[in-house]
């Protein structure tokens, strides 16, 4: 859905909820747990329930598939004319702290030239600069995440002093309570409008904003004219959608949160939230570089307790650690908050001191509304010498700038206005006040019309061919005496623009509702792609003779007429209820013909200062951006300088050059490189130490192809640095060591330090744990064993009665929070992964010790004969033993980290292919052995990352430059090199974000198998299939089909049997993930395969475009077309309802779509003609879209699911042949064998 920076609306066509049923919402483990089962106003609840687990498994990288970010265009802001007055700059002239300013503008905008069209305004309150760069999201490294329990109320933490009088007076006066009338944002057709470059500082008659509080950080923000980035959308399909208490799209304000986790990143927070959304989820996260919206703000989230959830938008501030990053994060939050307030017709009004308003902190909700006991974000803001009052002042200023009430930063303002001889020109058009409201209707554009309007302020509309078609209407706008409708595609939500009221035939519409009803319908009746469709929107006609069965699944009322959506004889569409009479029966849905995307052939070029590495798979080098094809290049996986970027149509290019010389390499497509921002190099004079063996590179951020040498000698060597450059967030230095010169990451340079022994006992004993009485929730690092006899576990310290805690007894858990309540002290226990809170225990029920900080180590030990075994957790009990002492005695233990527990030290590592903790007292360090390292050798294979708790490394066996694999867990890793160091095999390859790294072989797997319970027995599902009206088919005699019996079906559906067969197992291969095979290899597969020969590019495009495994597409096409030789694949035409094979224009169908058994050639060609598949490549790409939308992306993402649909047996099944999945599985397995690969992801249903 296009977001608020284009057309924001309350989820058009998706369902306006009737009433405001009281719902309860899940909250943190530290708060009272609510029951969700009574919620009745959830959208598509049955669909969400069915697809949640599948979607959840696929969403691991939080921003991997962002469908574009949008730029907001505000029609209400018009450049005013001003008199020739004395002017000043609108930046607030107050003292600013002398902090270092980050040179990156971190904006996602590029300049365009000679822009005479209405200009889109950025979400930032300042004019955008040209040549700005974006931090590469692929290098956002995810660290371990903390639990979601936030700060809780400390009565001493937040003083209840009255708000300063001036602050209170102005804010309340300037921001009365929101009314229903608003001035929301009205926007462009494009999902990414381009801001124009600013040649000169404009003048304005608007006054300068007068800050109400002193704030050096806010002054820094104003002085440096900080811009907010574009909002990224990272929505998750399985999050529930509930209306606010006043309805969809009607929040009452916004709540400020912080994540309460100093170690996490924005990606880590989002990933954790997606995996634990049942406890809490919020609308957005903000840090110093990005704003990521994770849930539609038209619907509530679970972030502030059961009282506040139905009222407010919840936004989390991710912790940053330096002055500039914190300032950017405050600027980003204020801009996002002001945008939300403006959009929803709300005005800034602080609720902090009276419990009434539109801007809240979590603390204020706890204090005035209840349902939660958190106190954020005050503690975090105070740690940066900032306050909520300063943030609110910035939000208010941003809002007033957006509303055109005060001068934007960077503009000039009138200080001494001259007396005008005639009235000054108003800053708003004279056409009158703008009001915008949500709408839920439909409209047809008349043949004679004024065109489509980008904004309602446009003087003329653009001509359109979209006439006499039914569109959804999502908003109405009134400007002066003129009324407009915002129209969009009914099925996709794509916006067309604003149309005048007089240019359309409009009807009211109720929200669609799900139904399950069968009707009879006369043959020849037309079906439409939309309700109240026109002759231009016919989806097909009912085939057959006499009455046919129409299975309805959806109903919508348009004006006073009822329309139903359903299927009949393989065709789906909408039909008026007037043409239907009650009865029953269903079938699959073809999709409408894809619309032709618009293109923009305007060229924009701007200077750039970055670096890039060309991917191994690329489209080549382009001499000019107008070239249709690029020239092959061997300059891959090397770092080059980037001097320019260009946009032409839908393509973006970088101009790359040799880093050390002026030699230009050529233009490359954006998708063919890994790009990073780069600051200009600066001269330095600094001496460091560097370890021998450290690689030097000829360029900063160099690859293995650009090694300049390695540091020689033994022990630390002296590195004299003469130059420094920042690449993305990393610092690289150029210098000389032992006669060799080159670049090296600063991470490898340090001041000499004495080494520490891995198992050394702490010299100073850790203080024994003593019970304290904190006045609020404190963050602690402790570890506890639950006593066998305990009083139980609580979801909140306020619960009077605890739940039975027997299952936690005699086990060890991490302690992350501590809180006093009355005369008792409670601690929050977390599971062994540190991430998920379990609940609160009274400290009297625990044995507690202090837990030190984990320290990385790399050492091998021998396990003593007498030992306590390998445990799941340090200081684990007998109930948490992974391997007993006898199983690991005198074995080799490979330690990777250590931690102190009280006076003891525990080490974490691997033994007998299992990982866990061992007490240091149970280990003996072996005598030193000279390390062995083999030379890296070429090795090409794609693995799956299986250990999200593992790491990837810049260099193998490094203790410093390593980063968490959590964000890449269960994703492919394309290996190009292999190296063995000290018996450990390492692989060098490419992560899913394009970054090259080293990973241990123990963190990788050749395949990933998941098992899912169906909840039914094999006999039950086989009985359903065998009892269908249209029986499953089997060939007992070649060429002769007969009905399959119960035993045939049961045998074919037995997943235990199939999973044991190395070929038949491939019917469980997940088909919703491409294999990323090169076009050349695909073409080798297709040699001699009829019309499919040399169609590798089409299969590759189809796989990437629709997220489908290309090996499956190929095998499916070969099976359906007889290796590309069938007439259906070779093509024909249907003229006067007869097949013509010698026509000039032929239509092709390579997947047998709609080729029904009674007349497969005619029906298949008719469908291909309707879809416009007049080439084989179009048939491949278009057919893949049908396969993806109707099966693979509908939850049936394996051959087994497509054939048997175990989630809903007997419905929506692709074939009738009981061997269909077996045949395709064998073919797919054969192709994998030919390329020396194996399937990566398997999903196997299990029956009771």
UniProtKB/Swiss-Prot annotation:
SUPFAM superfamilies in alphabetical order: N-acetylmuramoyl-L-alanine amidase-like, Prokaryotic SH3-related domain
Subunit comment: Oligomer; forms a ring structure at the cell surface which is important for efficient partitioning of daughter cells after cell division.
Domain notes: The GW domains are responsible for directing the proteins to the septal region.
Principal subcellular localization: secreted
GO molecular function, one term: mannosyl-glycoprotein endo-beta-N-acetylglucosaminidase activity
Organism domain of life: Bacteria
Cystine pairings recorded for this chain: none
Renumbered residue ranges of the record's region Endo-beta-N-acetylglucosaminidase: 768-1248
UniProt keyword list: Cell wall biogenesis/degradation, Hydrolase, Multifunctional enzyme, Repeat, Secreted, Signal
Region of interest: Disordered: 103-134
Gene that this sequence comes from: atl
Location relative to the cell: Secreted
Region of interest called N-acetylmuramoyl-L-alanine amidase, as start-end residue ranges on this chain: 191-767
Signal peptide: 1-29
Protein name stated in the entry: Bifunctional autolysin
Keyword Transferase part of the UniProt annotation: no
One GO cellular component, as annotated: extracellular region
GO terms, biological process: cell wall organization; peptidoglycan catabolic process
Residue ranges constituting the GW domain according to the UniProt record: 435-509, 511-585, 604-678, 680-754, 776-851, 853-928, 935-1009
InterPro entries, per the entry: Amidase/PGRP_sf, Amidase_domain, GW_dom, GW_dom_sf, MGlyc_endo_b_GlcNAc-like_dom
E.C. number: 3.5.1.28, 3.2.1.96
């Amino acid at each position: 859905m296009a977001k608020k920076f284009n057309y924001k609306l309350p989820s058009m066509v998706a369902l306006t909820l009737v009433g405001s049923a009281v719902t309860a919402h899940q909250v943190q483990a530290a708060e009272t747990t609510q029951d969700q089962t009574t919620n009745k106003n959830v959208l598509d609840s049955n669909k969400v329930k069915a697809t949640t687990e599948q979607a959840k498994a696929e969403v691991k990288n939080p921003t991997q598939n962002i469908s574009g970010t949008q730029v907001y265009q505000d029609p209400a802001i018009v450049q005013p004319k001003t008199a020739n007055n004395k002017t000043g700059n609108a930046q607030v002239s107050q003292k600013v702290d002398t902090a270092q300013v980050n040179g990156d503008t971190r904006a996602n905008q590029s300049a365009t030239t000679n822009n005479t069209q209405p200009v889109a305004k950025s979400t930032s309150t300042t004019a955008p600069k040209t040549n700005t760069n974006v931090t590469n999201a692929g290098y956002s490294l995810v660290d371990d995440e903390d639990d979601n329990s936030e700060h809780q109320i400390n009565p001493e933490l937040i003083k209840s002093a009255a708000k300063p009088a001036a602050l209170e007076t102005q804010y309340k006066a300037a921001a009365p309570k929101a009314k229903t009338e608003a001035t929301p944002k009205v926007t462009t057709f494009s999902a990414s409008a381009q801001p124009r470059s600013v040649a000169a500082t404009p003048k304005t008659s608007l006054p300068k904003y007068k800050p109400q509080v002193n704030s050096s950080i806010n002054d820094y923000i104003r002085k440096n004219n900080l811009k907010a980035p574009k909002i990224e959308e990272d929505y998750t399909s399985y999050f529930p959608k509930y209306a606010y208490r006043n309805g969809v799209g009607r929040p009452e304000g916004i709540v400020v949160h912080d994540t309460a986790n100093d170690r996490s990143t924005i990606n880590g927070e989002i990933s954790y939230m997606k995996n634990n959304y049942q406890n809490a989820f919020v609308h957005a996260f903000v840090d110093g570089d990005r704003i990521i919206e994770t849930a539609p703000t038209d619907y509530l989230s679970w972030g502030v307790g059961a009282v506040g959830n139905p009222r407010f938008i919840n936004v989390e501030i991710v912790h940053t650690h330096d002055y500039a990053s914190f300032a950017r994060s405050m600027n980003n939050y204020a801009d996002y908050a002001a945008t939300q307030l403006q959009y929803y017709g709300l005005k800034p009004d602080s609720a902090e001191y009276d419990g009434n308003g539109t801007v809240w902190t979590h603390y204020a909700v706890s204090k005035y509304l209840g349902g939660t006991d958190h106190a954020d974000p005050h503690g975090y803001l105070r740690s940066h010498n900032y306050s909520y009052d300063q943030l609110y002042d910035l939000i208010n200023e941003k809002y007033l700038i957006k509303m055109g009430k005060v001068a934007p930063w960077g503009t000039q303002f009138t200080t001494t206005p001259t007396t005008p001889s005639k009235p000054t020109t108003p800053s708003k058009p004279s056409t009158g006040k703008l009001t915008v409201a949500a709408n839920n209707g439909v409209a047809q554009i008349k043949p004679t019309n004024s065109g489509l309007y980008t904004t309602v302020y446009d003087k003329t509309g653009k001509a359109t061919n979209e006439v006499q078609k039914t569109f959804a209407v999502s908003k109405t706008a009134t400007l002066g005496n003129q009324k407009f409708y915002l129209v969009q595609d009914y099925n996709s939500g794509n916006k067309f623009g604003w149309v005048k009221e007089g240019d359309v035939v409009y009807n009211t519409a109720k929200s669609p509702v799900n139904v399950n009803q069968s009707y009879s319908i006369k043959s020849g009746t037309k079906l439409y792609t939309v309700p109240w469709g026109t002759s231009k929107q016919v989806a097909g006609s009912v085939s057959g003779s006499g009455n046919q069965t129409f299975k309805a699944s959806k109903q919508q009322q348009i004006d006073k007429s009822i329309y139903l959506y359903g299927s009949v004889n393989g065709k789906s569409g909408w039909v008026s209820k007037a043409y239907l009479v009650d009865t029953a029966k269903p079938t699959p849905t073809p999709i409408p013909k894809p619309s032709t995307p618009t293109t923009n052939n305007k060229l924009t070029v701007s200077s750039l200062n970055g670096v890039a590495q060309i991917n191994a798979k690329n489209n080549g080098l382009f001499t000019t951006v107008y070239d249709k094809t690029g020239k092959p290049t061997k300059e891959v996986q090397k770092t080059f300088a980037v001097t320019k970027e260009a946009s032409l149509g839908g393509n973006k290019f970088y101009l790359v050059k040799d880093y050390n010389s002026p030699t230009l390499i050529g233009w490359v497509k954006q998708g063919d490189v890994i790009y990073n921002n780069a600051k200009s190099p600066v001269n330095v004079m600094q001496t460091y130490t560097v370890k021998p063996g450290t690689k030097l590179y000829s360029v900063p951020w160099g690859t293995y192809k650009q090694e300049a040498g390695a540091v020689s000698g033994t022990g630390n060597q002296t590195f004299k640095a003469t130059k420094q450059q920042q690449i993305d967030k990393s610092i690289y230095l150029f210098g000389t060591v032992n006669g060799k010169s080159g670049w090296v990451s600063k991470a490898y340079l340090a001041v000499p330090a004495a080494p520490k022994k891995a198992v050394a006992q702490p010299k100073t004993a850790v203080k024994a744990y003593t019970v304290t009485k904190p006045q609020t929730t404190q963050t602690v690092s402790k570890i506890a064993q639950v006593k066998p006899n305990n009083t139980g576990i609580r979801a909140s310290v306020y619960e009077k009665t605890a739940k039975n805690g027997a299952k936690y007894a005699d086990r060890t858990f991490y302690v992350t929070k501590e809180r006093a309540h009355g005369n008792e002290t409670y601690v929050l226990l977390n599971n062994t992964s540190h991430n998920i809170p379990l609940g609160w225990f009274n400290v009297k029920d625990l044995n507690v010790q202090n837990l030190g900080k984990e320290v990385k180590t790399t050492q091998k030990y021998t396990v003593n004969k007498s030992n306590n075994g390998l445990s799941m957790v340090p200081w684990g009990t007998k109930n948490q033993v992974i391997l007993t002492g006898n199983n690991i005695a005198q074995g080799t233990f490979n330690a990777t980290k250590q931690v102190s527990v009280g006076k003891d030290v525990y080490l974490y590592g691997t033994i007998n292919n299992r990982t866990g903790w061992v007490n240091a007292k149970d280990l003996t360090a072996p005598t030193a052995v000279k390390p062995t390292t083999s030379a890296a050798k070429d090795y090409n294979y794609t693995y799956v990352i299986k250990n999200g708790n593992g790491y990837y490394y810049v260099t193998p066996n490094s203790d410093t430059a390593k980063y968490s694999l959590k964000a890449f867990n269960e994703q492919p890793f394309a290996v190009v090199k292999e190296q063995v160091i000290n018996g450990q095999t390492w692989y060098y390859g490419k992560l899913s974000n394009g970054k090259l790294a080293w990973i241990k072989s123990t963190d990788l797997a050749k395949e990933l198998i998941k098992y899912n319970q169906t909840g039914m027995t094999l006999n039950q599902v086989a009985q359903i299939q065998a009892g269908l009206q249209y029986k499953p088919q089997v060939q007992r005699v070649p060429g002769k089909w007969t009905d399959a019996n119960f035993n045939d079906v049961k045998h074919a559906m037995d997943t235990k049997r199939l999973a044991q067969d190395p070929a038949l197992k491939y019917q469980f291969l997940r088909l919703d993930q491409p294999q990323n095979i090169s076009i050349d290899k695909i073409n080798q597969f297709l040699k001699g395969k009829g019309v499919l020969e040399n169609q590798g590019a089409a299969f590759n495009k189809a796989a990437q475009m629709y997220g489908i495994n290309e090996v499956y597409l190929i095998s499916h096409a070969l099976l359906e077309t007889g290796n590309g030789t069938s007439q259906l694949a070779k093509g024909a035409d249907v003229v006067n309802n007869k097949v013509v094979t010698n026509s000039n224009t032929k239509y092709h169908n390579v997947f047998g779509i709609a080729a029904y058994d009674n007349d497969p050639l005619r029906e298949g060609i008719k469908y291909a003609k309707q879809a416009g598949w007049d080439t084989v490549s179009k048939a491949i790409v278009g057919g893949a879209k049908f396969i993806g939308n109707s099966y693979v992306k509908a939850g049936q993402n394996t051959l087994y699911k497509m054939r048997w649909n175990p989630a809903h047996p007997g419905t929506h099944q692709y074939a009738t042949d009981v061997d269909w999945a077996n045949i395709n599985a064998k073919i797919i397995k054969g192709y994998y064998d030919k390329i020396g690969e194996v399937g990566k992801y398997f999903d196997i249903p299990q029956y009771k």
